[in-house]
Amino acid sequence: MSEHKIKRVLIAGATGYLGKYAAKAFKDRGYWVRVLTRSRERLFEPGPFTAPALEAEDIDDIFVGEISQPDTLTGLMDGIDIVYSSVGISRQRDGLTFEQVDYQCNRNLMDLCQSSNISRFVYVSMQGADNIMDLAITQAHERVVSDLRQSGLNYRIVRPCGYFSDMGVLYDMAAKGRSFLVGPGHNKMNPIHGRDLAEVCVDTAEGDEVEVEAGGPDIMTQREAAELAFEVAGKPIKITVIPMWLARGLVKIIGLLSTQFGDLANFIVTAGEIDGVGPKRGTTTLKHYFESLHAANSKNP
């Protein structure tokens, strides 16, 4: 980073699991940080699965706006050098589709960048997208990537192999005494902690590599991860396997009732079928993450 000019970064998705870590990571590297949010309050609240609450010193400027409504974003890019976005649906609540959020909201950011002096756009997509292009979430993410490639913007793509926040569900089930897996759980993965992934995002923003895959230090099957969760929770292993044929049938029924929930269910089921392994860029182990969840659970039973 230049010694003469502090670079300014915009964090879009700052109230999400990864976005909170990203804001802290950029600030720790000396950046001036602006966050885009619908809710000031949510910035300073802890998120699920040990996502941190941001502190006042983590943020230089709070821009309150609705990313789906460009008319609320006037001035958002003023003075900004780098745009970082991990905007996307993580938990389906508002009845919005992946197309409306994961694609269109990021497209709105890109359009704003075209008329500004942005030096780089950093976008968080997903690893292994080529293998699951039939999914609505993948199509939305990769439309953003395609648009970035054609935009003329200087861009970087980060492709995580899954998030520890998603693995938190395995600990929650184990702590309650029974875990449910879609399929036998033989698929291999190495998800990454949000803190480690945020560091990868900053490295990518500053580096020359255009697309970066990022995984954690542990490669294991989904079943092994579930068994590890029981070990940390101090509970006997009790795993119920939902057969793929049944899971696929349920996805179809859910899709008939709600396109949005059907798309999300389809993604969850497909994730139980395919491997998601990439370069080991994280250092935090899944066991350490489960232990942090267990410690928090013990304090607030």
What residue ranges belong to the model's regions?
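N-terminal Rossmann NAD(P)H-binding glycine-rich loop of SDR-like oxidoreductase domains
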Residues: 2-32, 37
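NAD(P)H-binding glycine-rich loop region in Rossmannoid oxidoreductase-like domains
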Residues: 41-45, 50-108, 112-115, 130
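Terminal hydrophobic/aromatic helix or amphipathic segment near a protein terminus
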Residues: 224-273
